[in-house]
């Protein structure tokens, strides 16, 4: 369990883009997938692993680099570590909020709906750095299965997000 593994991994790497390239990745839909048996670290670390992961990375802040209109729907995710579904911006260190907005790094118009998750190492959905996201009609049947008990968590949560709607989830 010392390896970093993911079921589906989406990366926008600011370091790999040409200076004048559009860094916004639009209209990516992940639907009707079965993701299962993804082992990973079960302790707190700087690398989130799991079922469906979408990250914005880079060694420096690159404005206008992110996801827009990302849809994750009707998927089944079973026995994954650490998270069922998560996305975050990792080109900003320290005070995330201070740089996300002014540099247009928000992940915008994210939809996560109608997914079924069970036997999740930590949390079902950890949505970070998102604006105008909707998370609805998801079911998490068993979370915090292999995560150390000293670090409490919840099944679904926004982190450093604005105008995120979480509704009708179980």
Predicted features by range, described:
Residues 1, 22-39, 64-83, 96-123, ...:
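Right-handed parallel beta-helix
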Residues 10, 35, 54-55, 87, ...:
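Extracellular beta-strand solenoids
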Residues 1-26, 45-63:
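Extracellular beta-strand-rich solenoid/capping regions of secreted or surface-exposed proteins
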């Amino acid at each position: 369990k010392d390896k970093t593994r993911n079921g589906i991994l989406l990366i926008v790497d600011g370091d790999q883009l040409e200076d004048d390239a559009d860094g916004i990745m639009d209209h990516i839909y992940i639907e009707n997938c079965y993701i299962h048996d993804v082992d990973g670290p079960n302790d707190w670390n700087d690398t989130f692993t799991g079922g469906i992961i979408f990250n914005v990375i880079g060694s420096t802040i690159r404005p206008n680099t992110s996801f827009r209109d990302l849809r994750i729907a009707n998927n089944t995710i079973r026995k994954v570590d650490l998270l069922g579904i998560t996305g975050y911006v990792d080109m900003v260190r320290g005070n995330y909020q201070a740089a996300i907005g002014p540099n247009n790094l928000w992940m915008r118009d994210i939809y996560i709906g109608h997914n079924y998750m069970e036997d999740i190492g930590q949390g079902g959905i950890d949505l970070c750095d998102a604006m105008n996201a909707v998370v609805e009609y998801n079911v998490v049947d068993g979370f915090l299965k292999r995560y150390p008990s000293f670090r409490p968590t919840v099944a679904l949560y926004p982190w450093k997000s604005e105008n995120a709607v979480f509704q009708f989830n179980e």
